[in-house]
Amino acid sequence: MSQAIPSSRVGVKINEWYKMIRQFSVPDAEILKAEVEQDIQQMEEDQDLLIYYSLMCFRHQLMLDYLEPGQTYGNRPTVTELLETIETPQKKLTGLLKYYSLFFRGMYEFDQKEYVEAIGYYREAEKELPIVSDEIEKAEFHFKVAEAYYHMKQTHVSMHHILQALDIYQNHPLYSIRTIQSLFVIAGNYDDFKHYDKALPHLEAALELAMDIQNDRFIAISLLNIANSYDRSGDDQMAVEHFQKAAKVSREKVPDLLPKVLFGLSWTLCKAGQTQKAFQFIEEGLDHITARSHKFYKELFLFLQAVYKETVDERKIHDLLSYFEKKNLHAYIEACSRSAAAVFESSCHFEQAAAFYRKVLKAQEDILKGECLYAY
């Protein structure tokens, strides 16, 4: 009978696997995952290591769902099925296992656009952060927290965390994708501060880095974010130009990104009064929505149709705003209500316009309250 493989040796390999996951290196991560699974069959009994393996399978699938949404890998369990395995461990987790369990669960909730839930898990994970010695893992934590607070429009908190993450990533060339993503978050925060002149250099730096590493997905996302920044600053012409560039790359290289790009393009055209052209892109966007992960963008396209068609569908607008309210997406409520108010105001329906402007003010108030997300 062959000698059992020490669990410590398998643990080292899982650490290497995680390193490849954090670098978004799918081929290397796949190879190491297969090697770990083979080693586990011959490994000495170690329940902690098996839990660590389950957590890493979950994190691996989160990476794949982000980079290759809709792609299937044989008969592997989905991220939702994997969630069940890490939610019911055989014993109470402590130390690093507890940290990873909370941190990865927060990432899952973030991907589901449940930002309040995500931040709740991140806050619990933060209590275990002192035991994390790996500098890159600390950067990962600060990046994910900054990303969540950015989406909740807690701008100062987001900026506090993202600058810590970027400071680490910039010293590690293998983490260029995380550097790009950190630049996105910084630029987004500057946009929220209405310092558009400070946002664009970060986005242009991200685009340059994405082109240097020849990553089509992040080239498209960089162009999309540049377009969004121009849109927020009121430069419709430059916004449409960059949306079109992002759409071209998306159609050719990253089709799963296309609905998001076409939504931004459609909304900018609608606000600019070019509704006929916008509705062509809305139809194209809806045609590309197949995956469950795109449900959010389907709702946004339906919002544009409800607001900008000849007869405004006020009931549909309220239904969609209720959908955003359930998810605490106050920034979307603010932006969508503002668009609806402007349309009603332009057609001299001042009562309806006033009602939607009140929703804008309420959303701004909710953003400032921040759901008490960092009240300890």
Locate the predicted segments by residue.
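Amphipathic alpha-helical segments of tetratricopeptide repeats
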Residues: 34-41, 77-91, 123-134, 163-174, ...
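Loop-centered beta-sheet repeat module
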Residues: 159-229
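Helix-turn-helix repeat elements of alpha-solenoid scaffolds
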Residues: 21-38, 66-85, 113-124, 154-164, ...
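Residue at a conserved register position within TPR or TPR-like alpha-solenoid repeats
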Residues: 20, 61, 102, 109, ...
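Structural register within alpha-helical repeat arrays
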Residues: 16, 57-59, 105, 145, ...
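Alpha-solenoid helical repeat architecture
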Residues: 5-6, 45-50, 93-100, 133-140, ...
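Flexible inter-repeat linkers and adjacent short helices
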Residues: 1-105, 282, 324, 332-333, ...
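Long, ordered, amphipathic alpha-helical scaffolds
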Residues: 244, 251-376
